[in-house]
């Protein structure tokens, strides 16, 4: 697609000698003897892009495959919901839809309470941090082994939380004995970490970490943005879990989701938009939300009625 979009006339490669047959099949032609060293030989080859290249033509017609963690490809029934007529978030229809969606989320996450806010997953994490601050849980330990763990450190500090950072190399596992020692010696109110560190593709050992944290009576908050929907997991022993509509739930980004297993406190000195307690106590929807986003998420969640979604 890159070649076609930029209308190039010719392409050059240094092809590995092991794949010369494949290169010729695609249409590449050798134009020089091998280069490099005896241990690492390469074939100078070119591809005439003005010729009638059957392979390139076939590639141009091929469907693009999306391997991003988000945004993701949508199922046809989810796409269909995005074409529906918008209706009021104050309507009985929308209230009923939201309640049904929350019920599905609570079952999938295995949490007592689910809350939906209009925003990205970052908003979900920020709302959790506002709860921590509002509860007087000011001292925390943030675990990081990738880009999004590092982001949690920055976010918690912006919420004026006093945090230490247990940081290991990108993609490395946390030393559980060292974590236990840090929590025993420190005066921590909460621990915050990423379940699946998207930047390096490592699924952290949340079971073991949870056991250590809860044995100390410490509150546990988890960024599960790219693990929820991709990995079957019960968050019943986690106090707060953040996720969104736009990753492995396979809907459209735009709805921030917080699962909680503890009482949500009222935050009188926090921006209303971050107040999970306020969002939950309302008998109607507190802020404007596009009905099509809720329709799409509700439909996407139907794929999780059985465990087949995780096996395929």
What are these regions (language model features)?
Residues 111-141, 145, 149-153:
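Conserved beta-loop-alpha segment that forms the PLP phosphate-binding cup at the N-terminus of a helix
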Residues 73-74, 246-312:
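Active-site C-terminal subdomain of aminotransferase-like
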Residues 235-246:
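Conserved active-site segment immediately N-terminal to the catalytic lysine
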Residues 151-162:
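Active-site-proximal loop->helix
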Residues 174-225, 229:
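Active-site phosphate-binding strand-loop segment of PLP-dependent enzymes
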Residues 4-64:
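Terminal substrate-recognition subdomain of acyl/acetyltransferases
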